[in-house]
Amino acid sequence: MTLYRIALLTYSTEPRGSVIHTLELAEALHKLGHYVCVYALDKDGKGFDYTSSCDYDLVPAQAAPIDIDQLIQQRIQEFVSYLSQLQSVYDVYHAQDCISANALAKLVQQQQISSFVRTIHHIEDYSSHYLQQCQDRSIRNANLCLCVSDCWQKEIQRQYRIHAPRVINGVNLERFSPIANGLESSLKEQLGLSGSPIYLTVGGIEPRKNSIRLLQAFGQVLEDYPTAQLVIAGGATLFDYQTYRDDFFALADRLDIQIGRSLILPGVVSDAELPILYRTADAFVFPSTKEGWGLVVLEAIASGLPVITSNQPPFTEFLSETQALLVSPDSTDAIAQAMRSVIQPNVSRLLMQQSQSILSRYTWENSAKMHLHYYQNQITNIKTELY
């Protein structure tokens, strides 16, 4: 077996989906014997809150302008400046996002590297002309595009006329498990989780997480279950959703949903505490309107939680109606009814039993092997073009 030197690039050290994908893929490739180094923009100087057995290199990121176009431009240049000085040479340069892909495209243009791979987790609908150009360039200039779901594979083909082979996401069963480790009670006390039932979602407050409709649905649930609690964890994001957040909190005030009592907002949860947090909940609710895949859904299932999620791709690519309660993300009433149903013992028990079978299919080892197949093809193609 040929062993490769692989550079994986990600735009952040915060635990967003594509960042976790990068880190878990790196670990899996490392375990298969390949040398992997993760390059990540580190805007707060804190690095990863993640234990890694493979190398990583933190790319210094300075305070950026408020204007999003200028911010993205600066982040791309920070990557370019840092990578231009590297002495290390890799067989594969693999970007997991628009920012790092644009940086690699510049390095190809400057003839510092010969090619790069880009994983497209999803396509954004940018209102900014500059951001749309960045996204287009990150896709069109890549020598190989990969994607993580059938729905985005079709959309990439439709919008860009590019075939992006599909690779899978995975879930780390060494981290996410229904087996308690004795720290659940202390975390519940720390966060003020004394109610019942406890609903959890991960991803923060933002439009595509459908946070406002989830809050409206939770308001209905509180009428029947006044001691219920909704935990919205996470929230690290590159974009400013302040207007949406203001609307969210105004709604909470109108519905008299008290923060710290019924609504728990722990923010970004540490890598060590996240698996424990899943185990404190009674159900996982994720009525997202747009996802590349939905890693947190797999994490919740691995943690033994019954799941409510949207009745649309990509969720319907790996979940059936017997494995999760699939609801219209546009219907507050449907979300609320599912939240009432999912805590019924016969419903939750069946969902948990039926959903466990998907975990063996979605492993990071399987994902790494799929990546290696495409890496090998790409390396062969580049060598053929050179010689």
Task: Describe each PLM feature range.
Residues 289:
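Aromatic "clamp/platform" in nucleotide-sugar-dependent glycosyltransferases that forms part
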Residues 7, 193-209, 215-218, 231:
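Conserved donor-binding/catalytic core segment of Leloir-type glycosyltransferases
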Residues 8-15, 23, 27-74:
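N-terminal strand-loop element at the rim of the active site
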Residues 139, 268-269, 276-281:
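Short alpha-helical donor nucleotide-sugar binding micro-motif in glycosyltransferases
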Residues 321, 325-332, 341-346:
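Conserved acidic donor-binding segment of nucleotide-sugar-dependent glycosyltransferases
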Residues 245-272:
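Nucleotide-activated donor-binding/catalytic signature segment of Leloir-type glycosyltransferases, i.e.
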Residues 297, 306-309:
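Short hydrophobic beta-strand element within catalytic cores of glycosyltransferases
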Residues 95-100, 120:
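Short His-centered aromatic/hydrophobic patch
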